Regions:
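Membrane-embedded catalytic cores of phosphoryl/pyrophosphoryl-handling enzymes
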Residues: 6-8, 55-160
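Hydrophobic alpha-helical bundle signature of multipass membrane enzymes
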Residues: 1-64, 80-83, 87, 91, ...
Length: 160
């Protein structure tokens, strides 16, 4: 999903002559999703918390329980896509696209607790890690974008 959407953002930005904004959105999505997954993998290996005893009734997961990777991914992928839609999609359509994405992220986490493959604290940990990683990704992309804009402005200034 991330790769397809990132390619679509780049292609759409090129067609609309808004390549820079779309490229930053694609970079934000990639950094948020891939980095969040990496951070969750590290956290799972460090914590090593066992799954609830009812794991396997509805679904079985062999890895550690904390933090919930699905909860983290719901935030770093689906909520990130919803935020991108709020910025890039024009008009009222932005709400039709972004609201389901913004709701889907947290719902994924709730479903993991309902299925019995996570404790509720695993879900909260996944949401927290995902939200923190997504926010950090946004800050990094904004710093890169403002630095690039500053360099463009400095290079276009006439010499004194």
């Amino acid at each position: 999903v991330v790769a397809v959407v990132a390619i679509g953002l780049l292609w759409g930005g090129q067609r609309r002559r808004a390549f820079g904004l779309h490229a930053y959105a694609a970079a934000f999505l990639a950094l948020s999703a891939l980095g969040g997954g990496f951070a969750t993998t590290i956290a799972k290996s460090l914590v090593g918390r066992p799954r609830p005893p009812w794991n396997g009734v509805w679904s079985y997961e062999p890895t550690s329980s904390y933090p919930s990777a699905h909860s983290q991914g719901g935030i770093t992928v689906w909520v990130a896509l919803g935020l991108i839609a709020l910025v890039l999609v024009p008009g009222r359509v932005r709400w039709v696209i972004s609201i389901p994405l913004l709701v889907l992220g947290p719902v994924i986490g709730v479903s993991r607790a309902v299925l019995g493959v996570h404790w509720s604290s695993d879900v909260l940990g996944g949401w927290s890690l995902g939200g923190a990683w997504m926010a950090m990704s946004a800050v990094i992309i904004v710093l890169i974008a403002t630095g690039a804009a500053r360099r463009r402005n400095e290079s276009s200034d006439p010499p004194a």
